[in-house]
Amino acid sequence: MTKETIRVVICGDDGVGKTSLIVSLVKGQFIPNLQAVLPPVTIPRDFSSSPYSPKNTVLIDTDNSDPLAIQRELKNADVIWLVYSDKDSYERISLYWMITFRSLGLNIPVILCKNKCDQYTTNSPLEDFLDTKIEDEEFIPILMAFKEVDTCVKASAKTHFDVNQSFYLCQRSISYPISPLFDAKVGDLKPSAVAALSRIFFLSDEDQDGFLNDNEIMDLQRKCFGKSIDLNELNFIKHTLSDLTSSEEYPSEILYCQGKGLTKQGFIALNKIYTEKGRHETTWGILRAFNYTDSLSIDDAVLFPKVNVPEQASVELSSKGYRFLVDIFIKFDSDNDGALNDTELHTLFRSTPGLPNLWLETNFPASTVVNAKGFVTLQGWLAQWTMTTYLDYKITTAYLVYLGFQEDAKLAVQITKSRRMRRRQGRLYRSYVTDRKVFNCFVVGKRNSGKSSLLESFLGRLFSEAYSPTIRPRVAVNNVEVTGDKQYYLILQEFGEQEEAILQNPSRLAECDVLCLTYDSSDPESFSYLLELLTNNEIMKDIPVVFVALKADLDKQQQRCKFQPDEFTDTLYLDHPLHVSSTWSSSLNQLFKKIIQASLEPGKFTPGFPPDIKPTNIDYSSAVILGSSIGFLALFSYTMIKLLKPTQQ
């Protein structure tokens, strides 16, 4: 993006008027008999309304008698203002100056300025002064030979003609560089510029009909430039594109369609015209409004805004984030069936780098709620983004920007309070939770205990008898309604072959709100796996636990281990295992609600606390009200006694 300060080095042969140009710019008038070389002159941003103008511009005058000093200044320059005034100084542009710049390895723009234009007359002097077109016979050879020459301009320090314009062109070459946009050799916009403009067209096409109608053009104009487009200019754009349609340059492309609007190719052609005519600041105005940097990538500061997330806190979507995601879903659900099919999903993500890697890793859409055809529903769409935000909020902020979120992306997320800890019997345990709506549950158990079926049932899918062992981690996310119509989101994770390694990793366990310890109640060897895990991993006992006896629709078997499940949970002062079957929907609902309860009240589900010291939720507000009431009554009674006492005497 624009630098705070840019350095403009003015070069050229002796006598071309370098110093006079600087003085004419600063003083607004011609002053004769100047000193040979001026010290650096700093010009602040006080005349430009553009937010992309540099804060300060430093003009460096040069003395040709000290070539080493010139070289030092050139190596620190951001742009070169190269001045000539006659035939001899013009010839030295290509024979000396441009060769010198290249020998120094400079890769900065050069603004070529023909000074002292007041000395040249033609049959029409006014015409000569106003002729600043690039087709000038002196400029074209230079532009063709040296790609580093950004633009050319005629000026006169004596009459102050186009001195300000020359200075602006120096600033513009940095604030609105043409090199990222236009390939002079090919004579066309660069692919990266076409890609950026195509994305902007896509985001601006609100009704997704492939055209920018008048209202959409007006909205784009207001977003980019803060004002409505003039109707005459809009009609001129339409006529220009209509004339170009079927021209030699665009033989088979429709650029503008009467009654519909600009096509994507027409929008790109319009911006090509802007760059060819030296109006590329207009194109940059459009690009900058969509947060593109000079490298034509979206600014990282916009994609990944600084969000302060305290340790043991989590990140969730805010109401603005949810609202935007609902609107996006509705916008691209073109058949209004309440789900996004493959085509609609592909179209939705056209303005992004594609599906997030996290979604691919979690096997989206198998990770969330889909309809009978396997298409993600609105419920599943919101659940997937909820999980994404919880696991890696930076993915969410970046993709919301890609999808067209207009505000600061950090407004789409909110930070929960840090997890609080309390102490009982010398042990720390997690305090109750009041402000979180998203919880993370690790589903643990022996192979073939029914974990995968549990995840499938959580997403509302039909039970399958077929067994397929889980190798890679799996995840499922859905919303859960608890008593009082309160809605929470629950993430269930199954780890497959990585299970033991993850359970031995303190940092991974810290991410877990509840351990769902499952066993197959019809397999006598299943519960012993959990006993062994808890024996070998003491750290697991610091996390809230819910025991679950799966496959409860099958015959219950005595477990071949030291403790039976009910006995073991009694030793931990925990509830007996819930008996759950993937074919019993009521038991599933009971389990998911219990996991949410354990997340909200972790102290009650942490192993090892006897019932008499189980942490309870204290209604502090009631206590405060009660205490205040007692205090008020005491004060009132005391006051009345004091008032009545003299009367009694």
Swiss-Prot record:
InterPro entries: EF-hand-dom_pair (IPR011992), EF_Hand_1_Ca_BS (IPR018247), EF_hand_assoc_1 (IPR013566), EF_hand_assoc_2 (IPR013567), EF_hand_dom (IPR002048), Miro (IPR021181), MIRO_dom (IPR020860), P-loop_NTPase (IPR027417). One of its GO terms (molecular function) is calcium ion binding. It is found in: Mitochondrion outer membrane. Residues 192-227, 320-355 form the EF-hand domain. The lineage of its organism: Eukaryota, Fungi, Dikarya, Ascomycota, Saccharomycotina. It comes from the Eukaryota. The gene is GEM1. GTP 1 binds at residues 12-19, 61-63, 115-118. This is Mitochondrial Rho GTPase 1. Mitochondrial GTPase involved in mitochondrial trafficking. Probably involved in control of anterograde transport of mitochondria and their subcellular distribution. The chain crosses the membrane at residues 624-644. Ca(2+) 2 binds at D333, D335, D337, E344. GTP 2 binds at residues 445-452, 481-485, 550-553. Residues 645-649 are mitochondrial intermembrane. Residues 1-623 are cytoplasmic. Its EC number is 3.6.5.-. SMART domains: EFh, RAB, RAS, RHO. It is a single-pass type IV membrane protein. One of its GO terms (biological process) is regulation of mitochondrion organization. Pfam families: EF_assoc_1, EF_assoc_2, Ras. Ca(2+) 1 binds at D205, D207, D209, E216. GO terms for cellular component: ERMES complex; mitochondrial outer membrane.
